[in-house]
Amino acid sequence: NGWNYEIYVKNGTTLDYRIHSGIVANRWVKDQQAYIVRVGESIYKISWTEPTGTDVSLIVNLGDKLFHGTIFFPRWVMNNPEKTVCFQNDHIPLMVSYREAGPAYPTEVIDEFATITFVRDCGADNDEVINCPANELPDNFPANL
């Protein structure tokens, strides 16, 4: 689908992410609570529900640099994706109000594979890894790291 995401697993229950392209490009989130489990050698499953009502389930296969994601978007996000393009942490009550106003259905399911293009160890709980929207990053990101 041409979307480009960046995910930082901060610890065993929390992640930060930012979206570089796609219908919600420049959306970014910190301290998203998630279920993170190892399911095989270098294979992890990460799942969460956002304040928007969006459900996300990811499989990260570091050995094969393969990523599979299933995102369940409520209808209101598909109808007005621009409402979610923000630093979500500053707008959680607003996201909840959008979710409650709906509509939730029909749910849009995005189920796709992707290639993992960049991996690095940034340590645990490093708030500097994802600290701005994608459009504020250097042009040569992530090569500049």
Language-model segments: residues:
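Beta-sheet ligand-binding and adhesion/scaffold domains
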Residues: 47-145
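Short beta-strand segments that buttress and anchor functional surface loops
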Residues: 1, 17-21, 46-50
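Tryptophan-anchored aromatic micro-motifs
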Residues: 1-4, 145
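Contiguous, well-ordered beta-strand patches that form the walls/edges
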Residues: 24-62
